[in-house]
């Protein structure tokens, strides 16, 4: 099966573990989910045949949940429990760990200087963002008013882009979330947590941008 002409966001939602594969190749399937695999791979000079082969192998595994066919209210509930609640747990702990690592290892060349600040910015942005979704956009969609939500959706997508930009800064600050050989247990735990956060947030944004929002705007109830 040829995947090159399909949007990244669609592939991430329909092929198990495709999102992890895209992360490995640094392909943006959340905020950049509307671009085709061909375009995204070409822009980074990646071997498209290799990526398609890996996708074909992943596609043989049954999909646990087809969110493209799920009711919108079920998608919203999943987002609230799986992502909103989880982000509220993740970020405060990561900020504490980053603050400790920066303080204790301040004299080491591999220390992620500024990481706690960037995580705090992301925490502030996401806290405000999720509150707006929970108080304004999600109730509109659940009440069958999604087709009238173009304004709120546009704002949410713009904020998704801003969160994506912060993730790139965080990846740059942490050497693509790769701990140096001398990293202590706390440092490694911090980077494991950041990798989990990035995976969660990218899947979260992808589900909203590429499934929930388009279907709501199209008038689905």
Swiss-Prot record:
Top-level taxon in the UniProt lineage: Bacteria
GO BP field: protein repair; response to nitrosative stress; response to oxidative stress
One GO cellular component, as annotated: cytoplasm
Subcellular location: Cytoplasm
InterPro entries, sorted: FeS-repair_YftE, Hemerythrin-like, RIC_family
GO molecular function, one term: metal ion binding
Family per similarity comment: Belongs to the RIC family. YtfE subfamily.
Stated name of the protein: Iron-sulfur cluster repair protein YtfE
Species of origin: Cronobacter sakazakii (strain ATCC BAA-894) (Enterobacter sakazakii)
Originating gene: ytfE
């Amino acid at each position: 099966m040829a995947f090159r002409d399909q949007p990244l966001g669609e592939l991430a939602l329909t092929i198990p573990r495709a999102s992890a594969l895209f992360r490995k190749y640094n392909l943006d399937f959340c905020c950049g989910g509307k671009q085709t695999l061909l375009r995204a791979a070409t822009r980074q000079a990646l071997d498209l045949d290799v990526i398609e082969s890996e996708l074909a192998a992943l596609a043989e595994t049954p999909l646990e949940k087809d969110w493209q066919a799920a009711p919108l209210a079920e998608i919203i509930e999943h987002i609230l429990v799986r992502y909103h609640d989880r982000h509220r747990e993740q970020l405060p702990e990561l900020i504490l760990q980053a603050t400790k690592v920066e303080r204790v290892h301040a004299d080491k060349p591999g220390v992620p200087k500024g990481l706690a600040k960037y995580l705090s910015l992301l925490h502030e942005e996401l806290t405000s963002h999720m509150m707006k979704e929970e108080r304004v956009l999600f109730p509109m969609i659940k009440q069958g008013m999604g087709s009238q939500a173009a304004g709120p959706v546009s704002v949410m997508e713009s904020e998704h882009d801003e969160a994506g930009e912060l993730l790139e800064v965080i990846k740059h600050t942490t050497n693509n979330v790769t701990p140096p050989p001398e990293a202590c247990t706390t440092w490694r735990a911090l980077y494991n947590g950041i990798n989990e956060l990035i995976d969660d947030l990218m899947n979260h944004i992808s589900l909203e941008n590429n499934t929930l929002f388009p279907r709501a705007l199209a008038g689905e109830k």
